[in-house]
């Protein structure tokens, strides 16, 4: 045994001491012949290999690792047994066995268990029939061998080693000879209490082993042998194969021996009680079939222990069911003397973890860890960009995406919000909540979406975001579009594929910047191939709403459905759910046209809009406080999308870039992948490659700016068009350039998108949200505002500034969920032009630094200028988590004040000097954070430097 039992050295003395003491006492009390064996651990019992193994654990050859533990259990059991004799055992306690006749062997389904029937003649002339399993008989013989080494019983027990199937089979081979031997046992052996108990009817299950106090060693041996299946458990109905282990446990329990932990004892009742019952009751055979399940369960315990490298203690627990094993408490573990303190601590910790897991499973039986029944694929938070998990594990997955009419969308909010909120921890309370939510919602949605579920949209997770992966959790929501006939829609594309297929512009991005309590943003991306997006007909039908994703309002995140019309130029409808609180009505732009729509009408518009190519609903929550988006717990999301990235739209000349959609949600978060990249943008997302942004040199369509007060949260749909001139930068930090503001405006205007043309001084105000934006009219694009990305000037410095989606710029850095941190990012490029000029971007200032938000001078600082853009405060965590890199808590120092510092304060954020604004600063842009977390050196576009300090 020692050779096989890693814990032997630890248990050796303790176990030997206990066993020897028990054996000695049992032999002295009831044992006569066994007396010899008792004295010597190895010496007395050497004749009986089984006994030898067991009693002299040190010497014991390896019967099996489990044996040692079993022995220990037996030892405790023995103590129990010792007490048993004292207890009334029925007539058998007074009578002895006169003769044993073997009636026959019967094989049960489980061949491992052969039942042996005996007819026992008692000294009182009574005859009883006893049926024992082969394992019990083997154990019994092994015990006798231990008690009566001179009888050479070991010959009859080819393998006393243990419960191993191999050994059991061997036992069966020689079982006959053993049984025959039992019939011819000498009277002094038959009179032994152990024999009496074994043959007492109640004992059949376990009695035989535990009963004989005098023969504890025998019972131990039996247990060790694997006969252990024996009845103690048997009485309890425990399969005999297990029962051996169980009975071991029971004995200990009964005996209060160190092994009380054996749950079997508990389950059976005290081992003693069992024995008593066994004595009184006719022998009960454990159906082998019962044993099998237990065996499997035991294997489960063994495997579990093996993972913890504690399998050497398996014998201590093998009599326990997995349920009982997992329910062991610290107190229970302390009762196991054979466990070391380290093992107890380890087990305690692991058992607690297991309990928590099981509780979680119970709570969320329907939610698999990664893919909830709702079909939301949870990407465990990992910073790395991994293959996208297909959101659609099942139709349920589609549920996650509300393709339904808007009214159905609401139910989704809860789940999506949960998901988004749980971005940081894929599993956790949130996960539980989600699962419960998802289960209900799934049911609800499944019904709702059965039709739409026909086609599941692949959900692409742009893991690229994960780069900042501070918010590793990306939620991929499978999108179902009935209309989507494109088979490709059904197959989730790996993020790489997404990026690769720029044509798939119709990526649904669910970007929820959830600055949920965690202040982390989850990026939910729903992408489907363009075709998978609603077909034009559907859009025309107004099915768009169905295809459109509903934004989780609770998070105030915007969900963008970019349903690029299959035709590249088809204008995209942008609906921004302004924060409900915001006074501004959402602006919907169709291509060049802009409509002002009240938030309340958004749903309607979505439905009615023939081309719901892009539907953005921002939950008002983010802008909940129209006046200060910054304060809003959840920043709105700003998205730049080109519905179809037709090159044409890219053409700077086009006034309307129907394909390009810019959605600004007050807290501006741009899904990096979604953001359009300037052709130059190194960061450009491959997926977005089609985006015209890069090509466009002009500002965005003025219409995006139409709402003079960008304050209105409504997102403006900015079509990328080159704006011939940039409005003169206004001193106010407000976005001066519409195009830029259109990009950033949402972020810039607190909750409101800064759609207001730069010319409107109100831009500053728009930050406040306080001013309702003027209904955006398809105002002609204000003169293109080319802001110097390097210095933030309106272009007077001579460096060419191209309005570029700054987001593109940042996206990379913030590939993480909080892709667009510009709200937080005070990158000069952002600041200076609000967007990095494509050149600059290309120029290699990898991340433009936002200049002082004030650079209202046409600097598209919209991000900065709409300090709200920097409504970063709420987003800071988000950003920090996401981009860890850029986290600038101060972010645009004034970003918190949606009204960024205005002209009153002329200090330059960038260089710290006073008398000029950062937008006019000639120094490289520096982070606005006062803390000066870092200074980004932004190379002027002329210099093509891709690195940022």
UniProtKB/Swiss-Prot annotation:
Keywords: Metal-binding, Zinc, Zinc-finger. Transmembrane segments: none annotated. GO terms for molecular function: nucleic acid binding; phosphatidylinositol binding; zinc ion binding. The keyword Nucleotide-binding does not apply. Disulfide bonds: none annotated. Residues 28-43 have a biased composition (Gly residues). The keyword Zinc applies. PANTHER family: ZINC FINGER CCHC DOMAIN CONTAINING PROTEIN (PTHR16195), ZINC FINGER CCHC DOMAIN-CONTAINING PROTEIN 14 (PTHR16195:SF16). Residues 395-411, 431-457 have a biased composition (Basic and acidic residues). Residues 200-219, 416-425 have a biased composition (Low complexity). InterPro entries: PX_dom_sf, SAM, SAM/pointed_sf, ZCCH14_SAM, ZCCHC14, Znf_CCHC, Znf_CCHC_sf. Residues 61-78 have a biased composition (Polar residues). Changing residue 290 to V: In a breast cancer sample; somatic mutation. A zinc finger (CCHC-type) spans 906-923. This is Zinc finger CCHC domain-containing protein 14. Residues 25-44, 59-92, 200-221, 236-262, 355-457, 739-779 are annotated as: Disordered.
């Amino acid at each position: 045994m020692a050779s096989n039992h890693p814990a032997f050295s630890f248990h050796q003395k303790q176990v030997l001491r206990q066993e020897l003491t028990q054996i000695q006492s049992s032999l002295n009390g009831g044992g006569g012949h066994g007396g010899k064996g008792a004295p010597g651990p190895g010496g007395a019992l050497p004749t009986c290999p089984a006994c030898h193994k067991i009693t002299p654990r040190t010497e014991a050859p390896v019967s099996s690792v489990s044996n040692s533990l079993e022995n220990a259990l037996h030892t405790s059991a023995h103590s129990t047994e010792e007490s048993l004799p004292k207890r009334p055992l029925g007539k058998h306690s007074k009578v002895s066995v006169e003769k044993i006749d073997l009636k026959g062997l019967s094989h049960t389904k489980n061949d491992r268990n052969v039942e042996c029937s005996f007819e026992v003649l008692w000294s009182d002339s009574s005859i009883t029939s006893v049926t024992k399993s082969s394992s019990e008989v083997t154990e019994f013989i092994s015990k006798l061998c231990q008690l009566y080494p001179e009888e050479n019983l070991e010959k009859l027990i080819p393998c006393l080693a243990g419960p191993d199937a191999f050994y059991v089979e061997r036992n069966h081979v020689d079982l006959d000879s053993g049984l025959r031997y039992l019939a011819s046992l000498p009277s002094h052996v038959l009179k032994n209490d152990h024999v009496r108990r074994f043959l007492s009817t109640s004992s059949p299950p376990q009695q035989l082993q535990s009963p004989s106090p005098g023969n504890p060693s025998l019972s131990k041996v039996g247990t060790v042998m694997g006969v252990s299946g024996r009845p103690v458990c048997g009485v309890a109905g425990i399969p005999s194969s297990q029962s051996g282990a169980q009975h071991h446990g029971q004995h200990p329990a009964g005996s209060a021996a160190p092994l009380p932990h054996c749950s079997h004892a508990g389950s059976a009742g005290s081992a003693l009680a069992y024995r008593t019952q066994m004595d009184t009751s006719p022998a009960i055979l454990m159906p082998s079939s019962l044993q099998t399940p237990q065996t499997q369960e035991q294997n489960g315990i063994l495997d579990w222990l093996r993972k913890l490298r504690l399998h050497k203690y398996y014998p201590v627990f093998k009599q326990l069911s997995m349920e009982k094993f997992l329910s062991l408490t610290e107190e229970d573990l302390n009762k196991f003397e054979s466990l070391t303190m380290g093992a107890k601590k380890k087990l305690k910790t692991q058992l607690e973890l297991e309990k928590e897991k099981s509780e979680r499973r119970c709570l969320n039986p329907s939610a698999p860890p990664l893919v909830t029944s709702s079909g939301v694929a949870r990407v465990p938070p990992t910073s790395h960009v991994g293959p996208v998990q297909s959101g659609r594990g099942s139709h349920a997955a589609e549920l996650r995406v509300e393709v339904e009419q808007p009214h159905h969308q609401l139910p989704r909010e809860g789940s999506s919000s949960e998901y988004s909120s749980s971005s940081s921890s894929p599993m956790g309370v949130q996960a539980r909540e989600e699962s419960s939510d998802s289960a209900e919602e799934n049911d609800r949605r499944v019904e709702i979406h059965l039709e739409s579920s026909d086609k599941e949209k692949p959900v692409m997770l742009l893991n690229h975001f994960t780069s900042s992966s501070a918010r590793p959790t990306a939620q991929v929501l499978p999108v179902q579009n009935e209309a989507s006939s494109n088979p490709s829609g059904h197959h989730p594309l790996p993020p790489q594929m997404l990026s690769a297929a720029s044509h798939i512009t119709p990526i649904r991005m669910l970007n929820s910047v959830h600055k949920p309590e965690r202040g982390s943003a989850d990026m939910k991306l729903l992408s489907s191939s363009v075709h998978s997006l609603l077909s034009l007909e559907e859009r025309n039908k107004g099915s768009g709403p169905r295809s459109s994703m509903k934004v989780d309002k609770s998070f105030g995140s915007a969900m963008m459905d970019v349903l690029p019309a299959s035709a590249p130029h088809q204008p995209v409808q942008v609906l921004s759910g302004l924060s409900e609180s915001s006074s501004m009505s959402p602006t919907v732009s169709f291509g060049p046209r802009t409509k002002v729509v009240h938030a309340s009408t958004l749903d309607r518009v979505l439905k009615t809009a023939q081309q719901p190519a892009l539907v953005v609903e921002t939950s008002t929550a983010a802008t909940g406080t129209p006046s200060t988006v910054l304060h809003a717990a959840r920043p709105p999301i700003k998205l730049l999308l080109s519905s179809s990235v037709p090159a044409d739209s890219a053409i700077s000349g086009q006034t309307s870039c129907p394909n390009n959609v810019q959605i600004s949600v007050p807290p501006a978060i741009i899904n990096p992948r979604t953001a359009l990249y300037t052709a130059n943008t190194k960061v450009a997302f491959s997926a977005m490659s089609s985006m015209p942004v890069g090509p466009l040199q002009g500002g965005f369509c003025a219409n995006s700016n139409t709402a003079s007060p960008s304050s209105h949260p409504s997102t403006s749909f900015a079509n990328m068009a080159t704006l011939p001139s940039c409005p003169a930068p206004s001193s106010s930090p407000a976005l001066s350039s519409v195009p830029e503001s259109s990009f950033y405006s949402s972020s810039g205007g607190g909750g409101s998108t800064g759609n207001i043309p730069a010319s409107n001084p109100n831009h500053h105000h728009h930050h406040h949200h306080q001013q309702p934006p003027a209904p955006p009219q398809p105002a002609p694009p204000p003169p293109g505002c080319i802001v110097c990305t390097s210095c933030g000037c309106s272009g007077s410095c001579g460096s060419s500034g191209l309005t570029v989606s700054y987001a593109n710029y940042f996206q990379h850095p913030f590939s993480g969920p909080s892709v667009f941190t510009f709200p937080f990012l005070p990158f000069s490029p952002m600041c200076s032009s609000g967007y990095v000029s494509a050149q600059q971007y290309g120029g290699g200032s990898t991340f433009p630094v936002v200049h002082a938000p004030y650079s209202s001078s046409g600097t598209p600082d919209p991000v900065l200028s709409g300090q709200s853009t920097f409504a970063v405060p709420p987003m800071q965590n988000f950003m920090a988590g996401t981009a860890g890199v850029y986290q600038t808590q101060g972010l645009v120092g004034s970003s918190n004040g949606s009204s960024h510092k205005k002209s009153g304060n002329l200090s330059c954020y960038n260089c710290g000097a006073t008398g000029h604004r950062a937008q006019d600063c000639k120094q490289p842009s520096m982070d606005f954070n006062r803390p000066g977390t870092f200074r980004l050196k932004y190379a002027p576009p002329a210099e093509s430097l891709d690195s940022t300090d």
